[in-house]
């Protein structure tokens, strides 16, 4: 599955795989998505993978420090500028990438689903930008006007099977 993802994503000009492409890999990928000459913010990519496909991914720099700077081509001057921006409350400007993984028990269908979801975001992610807002302080992207439930289910039974809970109460 790792080789399949690597082949598919390495051929896509909008997907930038980080790290040496010829090294042996476990099922974890670090990548960025391009839209034209610019990168989509890793936080937006993570939000799109979650909101559109239910895929959990992480965005950021993975506590990689100097290695992360090397992967992203960030020199000392840029690193200092980023540090000052983040300290000034602009966490959204923190450099980083998207990380996602393939578990050993994923079947081919799940593997293909993840591969194609990333390819979809690479092809169409920029079109969704107007539907999202970013909190500059936290760097978190959220769909604007997203509907949130007003109340949580009262019981686990209601959460897992609302119809069964209604039948038990006679409603």
Please identify what each model-predicted range represents:
Residues 1-4, 113-117:
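A non-catalytic, amphipathic alpha-helix used as a structural packing/dimerization or gating element
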Residues 1-46, 58-67, 86-89, 129-171:
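Conserved small-domain helix->loop->beta segment predominantly found in fold-type I
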Residues 21-25, 50-51, 90-95, 106-109:
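A structural signal for short secondary-structure junctions
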Residues 49-57, 118-127:
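A common structural junction motif
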Residues 51-55, 59-78:
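Surface-exposed, low-hydrophobicity interaction/linker segments
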Residues 75-93:
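Surface-exposed acidic, glycine/proline-enriched linker/cap segments
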Residues 103:
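Glycine- and other small-residue-rich loops at beta-strand/loop junctions that grip anionic moieties
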């Amino acid at each position: 599955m790792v080789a399949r993802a690597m082949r598919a994503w390495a051929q896509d000009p909008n997907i930038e795989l980080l790290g040496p492409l010829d090294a042996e890999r476990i099922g974890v990928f670090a990548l960025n998505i391009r839209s034209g000459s610019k990168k989509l913010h890793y936080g937006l990519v993570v939000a799109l993978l979650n909101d559109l496909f239910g895929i959990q991914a992480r965005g950021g720099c993975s506590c990689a420090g100097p290695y992360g700077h090397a992967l992203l081509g960030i020199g000392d001057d840029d690193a200092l500028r980023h540090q000052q921006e983040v300290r000034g409350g602009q966490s959204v400007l923190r450099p980083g990438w998207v990380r996602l993984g393939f578990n050993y028990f994923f079947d081919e269908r799940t593997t293909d689903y993840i591969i194609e979801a990333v390819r979809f975001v690479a092809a169409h992610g920029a079109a969704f930008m107007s539907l999202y807002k970013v909190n500059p302080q936290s760097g978190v992207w959220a769909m604007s006007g997203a509907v949130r439930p007003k109340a949580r289910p009262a019981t686990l039974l209601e959460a897992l099977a609302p119809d069964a809970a209604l039948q038990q109460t006679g409603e």
